[in-house]
UniProtKB/Swiss-Prot annotation:
Alphabetical list of InterPro entries matching this protein: AlgH-like
Organism: Psychrobacter cryohalolentis (strain ATCC BAA-1226 / DSM 17306 / VKM B-2378 / K5)
Any single GO CC term annotated in Swiss-Prot or TrEMBL for this entry: cytosol
Similarity-based family: Belongs to the UPF0301 (AlgH) family.
Name recorded for this polypeptide: UPF0301 protein Pcryo_0062
Amino acid sequence: MSKANLTHHFLIAAPELSDPRFEQALIYICRHDKHGALGLMVNRPLEQARVGKLLEDLDIEVTDAQVMEDLALEGGPMYPEVGFVLHTGQPEWASSFAISENVCITTSQDILKRIAAGQGVGHYQLCLGHASWGKKQLDRELANGDWLVCPADLNLLFDTPFEERWQMAADKIGVNFDYLSSDIGHA
């Protein structure tokens, strides 16, 4: 089983993954330690969930027109009513922590107000819900061949169109799913 810390890596759902909630999912791992793992799907836009509308529903005035068009993402099946802001920069917000040198996750409303005004957040994605794994659960799924691992990069995380991210992550590690055996991970 994996002993590596996969924080700031992508999990690429293998085509044979049996859980339909994660079909062709690309998950950014925010935390991976001895207690388990937490990640956010970063390739599933919620077509009916515009960031601006969600902010207005929280009584936050939106003055940045682009925010009205930005799509929120389905972060995962756990707690879909909870928002997580994945963003570049430093953990300077009320409820924020650094994932890597230049990627943070924040759950407090202070960042939402700055996003609404188009002020100083840099790249961001608002994810509703998250994916999580218990102690050693992710290691078992990796050993089972459910996921492939790819180092994270900011272009793929924030700039690549959502519908291209899963394949682009696979391409980045040299995987062609057309030739991938369903027996991956087994000797």
